[in-house]
Amino acid sequence: MDKKASRIRRATRARRKIAELCATRLVVHRTPRHTYAQVIAPNGSEVIAAASTVEKAIREQVGNTSNKAAAVAIGKLIAERAIEKGITNVAFDRSGFQYHGRVAALADSAREAGLKF
């Protein structure tokens, strides 16, 4: 089993548990260059809010898109967009990534901005 398959296996297990809870989930994905966050409806078929370092405004604001500062900016932005849509409680889906570095920074900034998980 390679690194990606292991991560997907971990993500599947967590997503199955979140689906049982019928919770809106905050999904985080990271690549070597960018960080992405989406708030997905409990049925899994609708993206309620999204933010990523690919967006021009974020890239201009943070400069380097692959560090913790960029993840903090994404966390604040996704929380603001979710709260605008009336979502305050979410389940955090780390997509099999270790809760460390950019993933943890995004989660902490989203909590500080008003999301509860």
UniProtKB/Swiss-Prot annotation:
One of its GO terms (cellular component) is cytosolic large ribosomal subunit. Keywords: Ribonucleoprotein, Ribosomal protein, RNA-binding, rRNA-binding. InterPro entries: Ribosomal_uL18_bac-type, Ribosomal_uL18_bac/euk. The keyword tRNA processing does not apply. One of its GO terms (biological process) is translation. GO terms for molecular function: 5S rRNA binding; structural constituent of ribosome. NCBIfam families: L18_bact. Part of the 50S ribosomal subunit; part of the 5S rRNA/L5/L18/L25 subcomplex. Contacts the 5S and 23S rRNAs. Belongs to the universal ribosomal protein uL18 family. This is one of the proteins that bind and probably mediate the attachment of the 5S RNA into the large ribosomal subunit, where it forms part of the central protuberance. This is Large ribosomal subunit protein uL18. It comes from Aliivibrio salmonicida (strain LFI1238).
